[in-house]
């Protein structure tokens, strides 16, 4: 579908009351805005992703090293930021545009899919949930009860026909709190779909809660060392006269990491996912296998919290390559290097590892369930 996903993260975060602006605050294992970016990428139906940021937050955005998305500066208000984003993609001739607030990191891919499907027959589609609370309107010193069945809490992402929305933005006479309001004021039809109660908005600092389910998994792998084979450890090619024997590239570190993550997520093991009886995986790089597992775990709502890795080998010594391995794994898993710890161990020349005939690795992974 010819579509663009816009993420608004250009606010001042005044109500959030923190030295770190809200979009860059750690939430469920990574900066808040990365949740929306990663979900948009995994959804894999957007031709372009646009991130709108506050010009005062350049140092924060630079540290994230975000790639393959367009980053632009927002305006003084949410409406201005949305308009800036729409203008920035005018030449792309997108049919549809999804606009989302970075402050809502908990939307699901299922909700995105519903929005895109409804957009085939509508120009404006928004998710909403009915309030379960009693709602009153204050009038002077009195209050008036409002009918709950008529009260909706509006959420993002919101989906639009790009051309229709851009026309309304160009002709607006006053500011609006969200883009759907432009359709309301113009008397245009709006399609409301059922939102998600978990798709809450992070507004103040106390909204950041780690009330998530943390799960753990253990991974272990060992490979024989033989002549005339390449040696890969943690995705890094290690200079060595001998290498690991395996159906794939024989990387014991990435295999153990993969199994630990699968175990933590209750998703089986690496042998079930990538059978050594399947010729398709013959000599395949383990970086590709781990990348696929990361995509699968993200779709199920799991985020990696921490990896603790023991690489057990007499030779080579791991210290020299530790930083390379750490950065490689962090990149594949889409986490910060600070969430990974790597330790090199020997067996004091005991057993097959001590005799330099094998290399082993054990990993403990912790993950957070993003419900």
UniProtKB/Swiss-Prot annotation:
InterPro entries: IspD, IspD/F, IspD/TarI, ISPD_synthase_CS, MECDP_synthase, MECDP_synthase_CS, MECDP_synthase_sf, Nucleotide-diphossugar_trans
Region annotated 2-C-methyl-D-erythritol 4-phosphate cytidylyltransferase, chain positions: 1-214
Keyword Ion transport carried by entry: no
Binding site for a divalent metal cation: 221, 223, 255
Site feature: Positions MEP for the nucleophilic attack: 148, 201
Record-listed 4-CDP-2-C-methyl-D-erythritol 2-phosphate binding positions: 221-223, 247-248, 269-271, 274-278, 355
Family annotation (CDD domains): CDP-ME_synthetase (cd02516), MECDP_synthase (cd00554)
Pathway: Isoprenoid biosynthesis; isopentenyl diphosphate biosynthesis via DXP pathway; isopentenyl diphosphate from 1-deoxy-D-xylulose 5-phosphate: step 2/6; Isoprenoid biosynthesis; isopentenyl diphosphate biosynthesis via DXP pathway; isopentenyl diphosphate from 1-deoxy-D-xylulose 5-phosphate: step 4/6
Obligatory cofactor(s): a divalent metal cation
Region (2-C-methyl-D-erythritol 2,4-cyclodiphosphate synthase): 215-371
Family the UniProt entry places it in: In the N-terminal section; belongs to the IspD/TarI cytidylyltransferase family. IspD subfamily. In the C-terminal section; belongs to the IspF family.
Protein name: Bifunctional enzyme IspD/IspF
